């Protein structure tokens, strides 16, 4: 379920959780710096913390809880968001049987943004039991459905279960096997393709605001620096900077499943990956399996030190969750999905890279 911003935004001194001893309202009153009317387009500044009541509230049955994540567009714009509930002890979680209001914490990290009431930055999934699929279950699913394709459209020869952190850079070349290790391994693509040699985008600093209500309006060159495939197939990430990269794999999520991207292991590097972790049923699949996978776009930031990434380096894992029922409408153009069959795609506010290039006057 997409969650919509309400009519008021509060700028606060710091991020917080209310805990059991306080309400969100009392915490906001204690920490509030300013208040903004979202009935009109409103600028949110970078690295400031905002808390916004959402239009949705919940009255859940005792056996149903929830988990939230940023939407894809939110992650690609480096907007840090987290769901908060009254009495909540952790972000992004809704306890079973929760009845009450919902709030979202917003921190634009790279670009100032313009939002208004009704803007959708995050989404909520409801959970009843239904633990993530074990590797054994995932292997059985991979025998029935192709879950991973590669650039040539071919699926892997087989799904293989591996354990541990060996082969951090795939020795098989990344085009023979789908490696299952607490989910499907996800690796970086620093090679590019026949249609594009761009393997990453690095966000510029001190850019104009991005109005989230706009679609295909902004010139990518004003906000992003393209990184082309180096001969070494290696890229050094500058600490603190924000990058968009693509997975080597093209993933397919069958209609009866959803998926979630998680970091592979925090011990393999000081970086964060993929704010927007949900993959809807039908992602890279289509109505009847006719789509041969879709790349995952990875939002990556190195933290304290420069970080060297190599082609085919393991960077995350895709966890599959079985749905209670297959949805009536799958991910795709029929429901306005922006990123089906994507390559390395910027958020929908930006013009397609080739279109932006063709609009530049010739000298």
Which role fits each region the language model picked out?
Residues 1-363:
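DUTPase catalytic domain/fold
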């Amino acid at each position: 379920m997409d969650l919509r911003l309400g009519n008021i935004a509060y700028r606060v001194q710091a991020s917080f959780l209310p805990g059991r001893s306080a309400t969100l309202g009392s915490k906001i009153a204690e920490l509030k710096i300013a208040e903004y009317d979202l009935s009109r387009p409103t600028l949110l500044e970078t690295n400031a913390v905002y808390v916004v009541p959402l239009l949705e509230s919940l009255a859940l049955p005792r056996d149903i809880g929830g988990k939230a994540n940023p939407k894809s567009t939110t992650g690609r714009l480096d907007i840090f968001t987290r769901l908060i509930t009254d009495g909540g002890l952790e972000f992004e979680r809704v306890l079973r049987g929760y009845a009450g209001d919902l709030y979202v914490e917003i921190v634009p990290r790279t670009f100032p943004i313009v939002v208004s009431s009704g803007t959708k930055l995050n989404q909520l999934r409801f959970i009843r039991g239904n633990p993530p699929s074990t590797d054994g279950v995932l292997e059985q699913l991979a025998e029935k459905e192709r879950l991973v394709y590669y650039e040539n459209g071919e699926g892997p020869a087989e799904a293989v279960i591996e354990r541990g952190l060996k082969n951090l850079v795939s020795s098989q070349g990344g085009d023979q096997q789908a490696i299952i290790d607490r989910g499907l391994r996800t690796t970086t693509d620093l090679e590019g393709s026949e249609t594009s040699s761009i393997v990453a985008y690095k966000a510029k600093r001190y850019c104009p605001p991005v109005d989230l209500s706009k679609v295909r309006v902004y010139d990518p060159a004003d906000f992003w620096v393209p990184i082309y495939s180096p001969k070494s197939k290696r890229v050094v990430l500058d600490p603190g900077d924000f990058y968009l990269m693509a997975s080597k794999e093209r993933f397919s999520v069958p209609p009866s499943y959803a998926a979630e991207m998680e970091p592979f292991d925090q011990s393999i590097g000081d970086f964060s990956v993929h704010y927007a972790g949900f993959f809807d049923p039908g992602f890279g699949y289509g109505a009847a399996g006719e789509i041969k996978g879709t790349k995952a776009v990875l939002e990556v930031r190195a933290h304290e030190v420069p970080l060297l990434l190599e082609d085919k380096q393991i960077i995350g894992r895709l966890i599959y969750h079985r749905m209670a029922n297959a949805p009536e409408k799958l991910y795709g153009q029929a429901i306005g999905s922006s990123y089906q069959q994507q390559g390395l795609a910027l958020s929908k506010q930006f013009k397609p890279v080739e279109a932006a290039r063709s609009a530049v006057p010739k000298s």
